[in-house]
From Swiss-Prot:
Source species taxonomy: Eukaryota, Metazoa, Ecdysozoa, Arthropoda, Hexapoda
Keyword Ribonucleoprotein: yes
PANTHER family documented for this protein: LARGE RIBOSOMAL SUBUNIT PROTEIN UL18, RIBOSOMAL PROTEIN L5-RELATED
Family affiliation: Belongs to the universal ribosomal protein uL18 family.
A biological process term (GO) from this entry: translation
Keywords, alphabetical: Cytoplasm, Nucleus, Ribonucleoprotein, Ribosomal protein, RNA-binding, rRNA-binding
Compartment list: Cytoplasm; Nucleus
Purpose of the protein: Component of the ribosome, a large ribonucleoprotein complex responsible for the synthesis of proteins in the cell. The small ribosomal subunit (SSU) binds messenger RNAs (mRNAs) and translates the encoded message by selecting cognate aminoacyl-transfer RNA (tRNA) molecules. The large subunit (LSU) contains the ribosomal catalytic site termed the peptidyl transferase center (PTC), which catalyzes the formation of peptide bonds, thereby polymerizing the amino acids delivered by tRNAs into a polypeptide chain.
GO molecular function: 5S rRNA binding; structural constituent of ribosome
GO CC annotation terms, alphabetical: cytosolic large ribosomal subunit; nucleus
HAMAP family from the UniProt entry: Ribosomal_uL18_A (MF_01337_A)
Gene: RpL5
A matching Pfam family: Ribosomal_L5e
The organism's place on the tree of life at top rank: Eukaryota
Protein name: Large ribosomal subunit protein uL18
Length: 297
């Protein structure tokens, strides 16, 4: 069939249908979303859960959600800005922080469903592939699917660090090692040691050492927050190990204490009736006293 020019006449505009709003805004890939939210037809009223991972300049968000007609419902959420409670005070958007955030959301949802004692996940972090095995006499493992949104799924991306943390935390997420750091597309091989180094922030530590040797001014500028907190390259692995242990010990969400703000009043308070009468009486008395003083003078 040859080229057919689209004639934008009255009939064209009369039948024209606009795309979904979030497609017009460039926020949702509906081709992927359709395949992520549609449940098998032989599973009645069973939600299809998604592990939603989103990255921003200052934060990493991990949510477990399922779709309904009126909109998605968030079951559980974890954020990398919660990590300072576990000792990770800097580098809240790197691969190691993404792993910690994924681990946190996994332990939190399992604690909420009372499955945290049955499915402890992978406690010895080696960077190798780990798949959750369901227990024989008990509920199955919590299954969800990774939702990356519009992000690029390149090898070594932080999104897969969050997924690895969730898998090691005890969630059943279908995946392979092809997108983890340490996988070589040329050799079709996976080096778990490289992946483990990223999980414990050793790629950051190596860069700290290199930069400190080559350019001290650049080191002080790049790692100023690390220097202010007294964190050195050799301390990073210990920090993340302690964070993993702390997350497993207490993954529950803690609300921030409410700030008690002292209200400042910049306008005069409204007087009561008695106060107004007393004020007028005082003015009258002062005025009469002044007149009396003038007469006597």
């Amino acid at each position: 069939m040859g080229f057919v020019k689209v004639v934008k006449n009255k009939q064209y505009f009369k039948r024209y249908q606009v795309r979904f709003r979030r497609r017009r805004e460039g926020k949702t890939d509906y081709y992927a979303r359709k395949r992520l939210i549609f449940q098998d037809k032989n599973k009645y009223n069973t939600p299809k859960y998604r592990l939603i991972v989103r990255l921003s300049n200052r934060d990493i968000t991990c949510q477990i959600a399922y779709a309904r007609i009126e909109g998605d419902r968030i079951v559980c959420a974890a954020y990398s800005h919660e990590l300072p409670r576990y000792g990770v005070k800097v580098g809240l958007t790197n691969y190691a922080a993404a792993y910690c955030t994924g681990l946190l959301v996994a332990r939190r949802i399992l604690q909420k469903l009372r499955l945290d004692t049955l499915y402890t996940g992978c406690t010895d972090v080696t960077g190798e592939e780990y798949l959750v095995e369901p227990v024989d006499d008990g509920p199955g493992a919590f299954r969800c699917y990774l939702d990356v949104g519009l992000a690029r799924t390149t090898t070594g991306a932080r999104i897969f660090g969050a997924m690895k943390g969730a898998v090691d935390g005890g969630l059943n997420i279908p995946h392979s090692v092809k997108r983890f750091p340490g996988y070589s597309a040329e050799n079709k091989s996976f080096n778990a040691e490289v992946h483990r180094a990223h999980i414990f922030g050793q790629h950051v530590a190596d860069y700290m050492r290199t930069l400190e040797e080559e350019d001290e001014d650049a080191y002080k500028r790049q790692f100023s927050k690390y220097i202010a907190l007294g964190i050195k390259a050799d301390d990073i692995e210990t920090i993340y190990k302690n964070a993993h242990a702390g997350i497993r010990k207490d993954p529950a969400f803690h609300k921030k204490p409410e700030k008690k703000v002292t209200k400042k009043r910049f306008n005069l308070a409204k007087l009561t009736l008695e106060a107004r009468k007393a004020k007028i009486a005082k003015h009258k008395a002062d005025f009469l006293a002044k007149i009396q003083a003038d007469v006597e003078a």
